[in-house]
Amino acid sequence: MATLAERRRIARLVHRFGFGPRPGEFSNLLAGGFNQAAEKYLSVPSQDAFADNQDEPVVRDQGKRPAPNSPDVVSYATEKRAQLTSLSFWWLDRMVLSEHSLRERMTWFWHGHWATSYQKVDDALPMYLQNQSLRRNALGNFAQMSREMVNDAALIFWLDGQTNTVKAPNENLSRELMELFTLGVNRYSEEDVKETAKALTGYKIDKSSGQVNFYPKQHFSGAIKVLGTQSTFDASSLSDFLVARSDSALFITERIWYRFISTMNPLTDTSLTSSFASRDIAALVKAIGRHSALDNPDNSMVKSPIDWFVSASRALSITPSKFSNPNNIRNYLDLLGQRPFFPPNVGGWPADQAWLSTSSAQYRIQFATQLVKEADLSPISSLAPNARINGLADWLGVVEWSSRTKMALNGAIRDPARLALLALCSPEYVVSA
């Protein structure tokens, strides 16, 4: 039998670097031990039977919005909503059903890192193209990812890059490129912001198609001075220059640590950056996932709404797009404050204890009630009543129940639906160990 410490470590691995266990998976991982579990969860998958065969979302270039008095306005708006719905549930299905969830988990992390919202972009195709870029590079090379992102139509539009000209510089993209995407706070100067904005001129987008075009005559072609280095740059070479700096290696390591290990105990082991020397994301994730800090009982972390919903859906064998009323999923994710493709700002979503509130607890109960109605409860209902509480912990990947939670669960021991509902809303499940 696994020790409590081993159980905690594996539970954290499964919930933080995946999206929680499928029925029976946690018990199997416990039997194999942490090293075997880490090898499974932290390795880059070569194939994924579901993801490799999933149909693509129905998204296309709709062209420009029709004039307000055009007869095409209604059909245009209807298709726009349908495309967003298709894209959203396509990704939720991938999160829930992918056999190797690390890639989707990291795609979700990078979506929050390069936070871009449909709220402003207002076209599904460029959001889809960005999402595919993030997925393609999610466990690849960060230099390549950054290069693709500074040439990404959705991000450029989101941060007003298309209005950045030599005569009228717009510094939004240049500032966030350094502060939020590659270097971090206090690792650049205001003069660096002004200079890097020049390197990002000349890029124009066709938003509905997600295409980016470079116009050399509209680009500042002279030398600029950035972080003490004078040279000529375009968007890609500027990105390479920033990512190559040691500050960038430390910053990305800090960000992954913050989201996967602890928001309360900042990174102090800077030796982890050596795993990121070549900007290999997979190597860094593997090093962080095997770090001893994963064992620290103090490093608990509240599940975000997406983490909670996706992990619950995996346990309950629910496919989001096949939910009887998919709008309920969208509405509850909105109420809980986290919906794919809608980060609140360029800084992305909050983390950890920011997700705890009286209102969120009420919405979570209501949402869980809907989920349980459509769940496969056989992993619990098939057990004898006196085995259900322990079986429930193994089903959901919970470390252990508190005496208070056990008492509540005991009261529902003969009602599998209520038992599942109580467990999904319990502190032990809402908080990742």
Language-model-detected regions and their locations in the chain:
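Flexible, low-complexity segments enriched for small/polar residues
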Residues: 2-23, 245, 249-433
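Short, compositionally biased low-complexity segments
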Residues: 8-16, 58-64, 79-82, 168-172, ...
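N-terminal accessory alpha/beta regions
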Residues: 23-137
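Hydrophobic residues in alpha-helical segments
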Residues: 29-30, 41-42, 96, 134, ...
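Active-site substrate-binding loop specific to GH73 endo-beta-N-acetylglucosaminidase modules
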Residues: 67-69, 87-91, 123-324, 328
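A ubiquitous short alpha-helical element
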Residues: 73-77, 115-117, 161-164, 240, ...
